[in-house]
Curated annotation (Swiss-Prot):
HAMAP family: G6P_isomerase. This is Glucose-6-phosphate isomerase. The active site is at 359 (proton donor), 390, 518. GO terms for cellular component: cytosol. The gene is pgi. GO terms for biological process: gluconeogenesis; glucose 6-phosphate metabolic process; glycolytic process. Pathway: Carbohydrate biosynthesis; gluconeogenesis; Carbohydrate degradation; glycolysis; D-glyceraldehyde 3-phosphate and glycerone phosphate from D-glucose: step 2/4. It holds the Pfam family PGI. GO terms for molecular function: carbohydrate derivative binding; glucose-6-phosphate isomerase activity; monosaccharide binding. Catalyzes the reversible isomerization of glucose-6-phosphate to fructose-6-phosphate. InterPro entries: G6P_Isomerase, G6P_Isomerase_C, Phosphoglucose_isomerase_CS, SIS_dom_sf, SIS_PGI_1, SIS_PGI_2. It catalyses: alpha-D-glucose 6-phosphate = beta-D-fructose 6-phosphate. Belongs to the GPI family.
Length: 554
C-alpha cells in the first residue's frame, strides 16, 4: 500500500515523544565542549558519497540524537516511502500522480511501469531527440531565416522551467561550448525583455518556449513578445519554425503558435516543474554545456538516487540532512535555513532550492487533507560566499533566532587568481567555526585587555563582543563543480525535501497555493484594463486598482 494512504500524526509517535524528551536533555549541550571531549567527533559525524563530502559534526547532536532521528524515520516508514517514490506509486495524492523525476536519469535498460506502460523507452527517445537538436545547433546545421547559424538561445520559462536550468548552465559555465550563448527570460516585465533583446540578433536567435500547458501567463506573454520582436526585426511567419521550438505537453497550442510538431519536446504529468531540469526542460543546459556533459549531470543525479535507496539511514546523506532539518524546525524552533555557497558559479543555487523546498513543503495539511500538527517547511534563503559575511552573517552570529546553515564549497577553482581560492575556502571554514565556537565573556574581556582597553572600557564593551556560538551548520565539500557532482548535489536536496515531507505526512509534489494567485490575477487584470466593472473582493485590492487607473497612462 502506498505510504500516503496511511497518514500519520507524527507528533503522536513514540519516536517523536522520545525526541521531545531528548531535546530537554540537550538544552545545555555545547558543541565546543563536545569537540573538546571527543577527538573522534569529526570522524563520527562525516560521510562521503557521489563525489560529495558532508561534515555535519557542527550540529546540536550526539550519537543518541542521530539514533532517535533515525528511529523517527523508521516509525514513519521512510523505507517504504522511498520504495513508493522510485517504483512509480501514487505519491502525489491530490493530483493522483506518481513523481518520477528520478526516471529521467535512469539507464536505458531499466524498466519502470506507469499505468502498466514502461516509460523508459520514451524517456530515452526524448534524450535522443535532445541529442540530435544539440548536435545540429553546435555543428552550425540549424540555421535562421538568413541561413546564418544559431548563436544565441533564449529559454522562455518561469519557475521550474527557469530556476533549475539557469542554476546548472551558470554553475557549469567552465564547461560551456563555444559558439552558442544561452539566455533566460522569465519575468513578465518589459524591462527584462528589453535588456535581453538589446543583446540579440533575430536572424541568429532560437527561442525555447518551456511550458507544460503552453498557457503559463508569463511564459506565453514573453513568447508572444519574442515573436513580435522577431517579425519586427525582419523575420517572416513562414520562417518562424527556424526560431521557435517548444517543451510542452500541449502540442496543439504550440503548433497554433507556429512551432512545428517535430520541434516540440514532450513533458509528462509525472514530472513536476521544480524537478524537471533532468527532462527536455534541461534543453538549454545541454545546449550550454554539450550533450556528453548533460549526460554526466544525469549520471551524478542517478548515483545519488542509488545512494538514497541503498545506504543505511545512519549513513544516508539526504536522510541525515532532512532529519537535522526536522530536529531544528520542530524541536529547536528554527523558522529558516540558510544556503551559503562559497563559489561564484553556484550563486543561483539558493534560488533553485527556495523553489524546491518552499514550494514542495510549504503545506499545512497532510496527504489526506487533515491539518498538520507541527511546523513544516522552513524559509530558505542565503547567498554567495564572502558577500554574505558583510551583509547578513551578523544576524547568524549574534541575532536572537536559531538559523541552521549549509555551507557549500569546492576545493578547486576553475579560475585561480593568486591565493584567492585559499582565502575563499578559509573564509567558508572560519564562518562555520565561528558559528560553532562563538566568543565567551571571558574571551571578550581578555581580548579587550590585550588591546590596552581600560577596565571601564572592558566592562562597557565586552557584552557587545560576546558571540553565543553553538549555532549549527553543515559543510558540503566537492573537489570541483563538475557536471556529475552538481547532478548529485541537486538530487541530494531533492531527496532531502522528500524525506521531510514523509516525516510530516504532507505532499511535496503539488502547489495549490500558486494556483490561487493565478486565478485571482485574471480578475485583477480585467479590472485594471476596464473590461470588468464589478468591484474587487476586498477594499484594499480595489483601492490599489483605482490608484493605478488614476495614474497609469500606458
Amino acid at each position: 500500500m502506498a505510504y500516503y494512504r496511511t497518514p500519520h500524526d507524527v507528533t503522536a509517535l513514540p519516536a517523536w515523544q522520545a525526541l521531545n524528551d531528548h531535546r530537554k536533555a540537550m538544552q545545555d549541550f555545547s558543541m565546543r565542549e563536545a569537540f573538546n571531549a571527543d577527538p573522534q567527533r569529526f570522524t563520527q559525524f562525516t560521510l562521503s558519497s557521489c563525489g560529495l563530502f558532508l561534515d555535519y559534526s557542527k550540529n546540536l547532536i550526539n550519537a543518541q540524537t542521530r539514533d532517535l532521528l533515525v528511529g523517527l524515520a523508521n516509525e514513519v516508514d521512510l523505507k517504504g516511502a522511498i520504495k513508493s517514490l522510485f517504483e512509480g506509486e501514487i505519491v502525489n495524492a491530490s493530483e493522483n500522480r506518481p513523481a518520477l523525476h528520478t526516471a529521467l536519469r535512469r539507464p536505458v535498460g531499466d524498466k519502470l511501469l506507469v499505468n502498466g506502460v514502461n516509460v523508459m523507452p520514451d524517456v530515452h527517445k526524448v534524450l535522443n531527440q535532445i541529442t540530435d537538436l544539440v548536435g545540429r545547433i553546435h555543428d552550425g546545421l540549424w540555421r535562421g531565416y538568413t541561413e546564418k547559424p544559431i548563436t544565441d538561445v533564449v529559454n522562455i520559462g518561469i519557475g521550474g522551467s527557469f530556476l533549475g536550468p539557469e542554476l546548472v548552465s551558470e554553475a557549469l559555465l567552465s564547461y560551456a561550448q563555444k559558439g552558442v550563448r544561452c539566455h533566460y527570460l522569465a519575468n513578465i516585465d518589459g524591462s527584462e525583455f528589453h535588456e535581453l533583446t538589446m543583446k540579440l540578433r533575430a536572424e541568429t536567435t532560437l527561442f525555447i518556449v518551456s511550458s507544460k500547458s503552453f498557457n503559463t501567463l508569463e511564459t506565453l506573454k514573453n513568447a508572444q513578445a519574442a515573436r513580435a520582436w522577431y517579425l519586427a526585426q525582419g523575420g517572416s511567419e513562414a520562417e518562424l519554425y527556424r526560431h521557435f521550438i517548444a517543451v510542452s505537453s500541449n502540442n496543439a497550442a504550440a503548433v497554433a503558435f507556429g512551432i512545428r510538431e517535430e520541434n516540440i519536446f514532450p513533458m509528462w504529468d509525472w514530472v513536476g516543474g521544480r524537478y524537471s531540469l533532468w527532462s527536455a526542460i534541461g534543453l538549454p543546459i545541454a545546449l550550454a554545456i554539450g550533450m556528453s556533459n548533460f549526460k554526466e549531470l544525469l549520471s551524478g543525479a542517478y548515483s545519488m538516487d542509488q545512494h538514497f535507496q541503498s545506504a543505511p539511514f545512519e549513513q544516508n546523506m539526504p536522510v541525515l540532512l532532512a532529519l537535522l532539518g526536522v530536529w531544528y524546525g520542530n524541536f529547536w524552533g528554527a523558522q529558516s535555513h540558510a544556503i551559503l555557497p562559497y563559489d561564484h558559479y553556484l550563486r543561483n543555487i539558493t534560488k533553485h532550492l527556495q523553489q524546491l523546498d518552499m514550494e514542495s513543503n510549504g503545506k499545512s495539511v497532510r496527504q489526506d487533507g487533515t491539518p498538520v500538527s507541527t511546523d513544516t517547511g522552513p524559509v530558505i534563503w542565503g547567498g554567495v560566499g564572502c558577500n554574505g559575511q558583510h551583509a547578513y552573517h551578523q544576524l547568524l552570529h549574534q541575532g536572537t533566532q536559531l538559523i541552521p546553515a549549509d555551507f557549500i564549497v569546492p576545493i578547486v577553482s576553475f579560475n585561480p587568481v593568486s591565493d584567492h581560492h585559499q582565502w575563499l575556502y578559509a573564509n567558508c571554514l572560519s564562518q562555520s567555526q565561528a558559528l560553532m565556537l562563538g566568543k565567551t565573556r571571558a574571551e571578550a574581556e581578555x581580548e579587550l585587555r590585550d588591546k590596552g582597553a581600560s577596565e571601564e572600557e572592558v566592562q562597557k564593551l565586552a557584552s557587545h563582543k560576546v558571540i553565543p556560538g553553538n549555532r549549527p551548520s553543515n559543510t558540503l565539500v566537492v573537489e570541483r563543480i563538475s557536471p556529475r557532482r552538481l547532478g548529485a548535489l541537486v538530487a541530494l536536496y531533492e531527496h532531502k525535501v522528500f524525506v521531510q515531507s514523509v516525516v510530516w505526512g504532507i505532499n511535496a509534489f503539488d502547489q495549490w497555493g500558486v494556483e490561487l494567485g493565478k486565478e485571482l490575477g485574471k480578475g485583477v487584470y480585467n479590472r485594471l484594463v476596464g473590461s470588468e466593472e464589478s468591484l474587487a473582493e476586498d477594499a484594499s485590492t480595489q483601492g490599489l486598482i483605482n490608484y493605478f487607473r488614476g495614474r497609469h497612462r500606458g
